[in-house]
Amino acid sequence: MKKLNLVVLASISTSMAFAAGFGLYEGSARGNALGGAVMGKAVDASANFYNPATLSDLTGTVVTVGMTTEHPTADMYVDGHSSRKMDPGCFVLPHAYIAQPLPWGFTFGLGIAPEYGLGTHYHKYWSMAWDTRDTTIEGISFNPNLAYAITEDWSVSAGIRLMYFSFNQHSDQMAVQDGHSYGTVRDHLRGDNGMTDWGWQLSSRYKITEKLSAGVLYKSFIDCKIKGYNHTRVEKYDDSAIAEQVQKGVQAALAGNGITPGHPMYNTLFQQYYSQYYGAAVAEAHSKVDQGAASAEGPAAAKVRLPQSLTMGLNYDVTDDLHLGTAVTWTQWSCMEEINFHLPGDNDKTVPLRWNDTWRVGFGAAYDLTENLTLMGSYIFDQDPCRRYYGTSMLPPGDRQIATIGFGYMWGNFDISASYGLVFMAGDSLFIHDGTGARHKLESSNGLSHAAAVTVSYRF
């Protein structure tokens, strides 16, 4: 029997917040409540995340800290049959920022926040465990920025994005030969980039009028080189293919000697030879599965190109109390044509993604109910990058719509904000191939994520 290969279908595909691709846009409670439509003005040090050029608006040292919690779920269907629910539990996405004015019109800023994230979890016995049982990705950016006010109306900034990127996945891989699965190998693939990869960003803000301002932010590609380890162990053997193959082999051998069904010796000879060859074939197959699992154990590596993006936005003060904003983000997810995993033995795998570029559009409004209390709300439409015939169960298919409300309260030098949002995922479907080459239809429905956030700022 030939060597059996583990079909490792590891790939990177969904986010904790059900955002398109695996990008995260939750930089602060106020930013969440306004749908990211804060490109033209800064309120706190989270400007490091949304548009660092607006750091020039801040006077004095400002420290901003907080977190967003996410809980995504979805009902999944495989080949038209109800399957296990996707429910990874609750994730916490912390953020921390500082802004410090400097002489000669400069402002220094530093942001620490997750830019990328993934979290999916299925029951270990769900029908696509060969694709994934659970996957977690963390992409945390350490982002120093320097803003400069060229004039009272125009400011610019430049920054470095030092990225820590980690990947962790459990799956039940197929041990495959000639299109047949002979067993299941429990696989645990993990790794990170050691925080050695970086990119950059540029932004600008211009006050068109006293009430209208515009902002733009560009983020570069980041090429991440992930190194880690692949752990394997045999979960179970599948002898169904062996039984079928031995049966056909014995029948062919008997027919070659003129013994076919109906011959008086057929049943006796069939049982004799079947018993003889079946045991040997099973022992050999089990040995090959064990060898395949052992060969896949060891150091692993992968390369991932994080996409470039461009965000543009406007902010308009309708009155002294009513403020409107919009933000549009283009992300070049098409740069992720495929992901190449370098695994021990002969188990290297190229996972085709062929994603589409996406647009994310947000509209936000804020109303100053009192001098200290502001009410906020927003709506976001977020495109799904997946193509119908390329994908994995880690990314339930479908565009996202997000509705968020929130408030901000000024108390002395403190600025406290909180938000709550619902992420609605449109039901859709895609096709995934298993290790034998068979195609399966994955459908999602009732996709929903709860997103709650709180952020506190202090002005020194």
Regions found by a protein language model. Give the residues of each.
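Gram-negative bacterial Sec-dependent N-terminal signal peptides
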Residues: 1-19
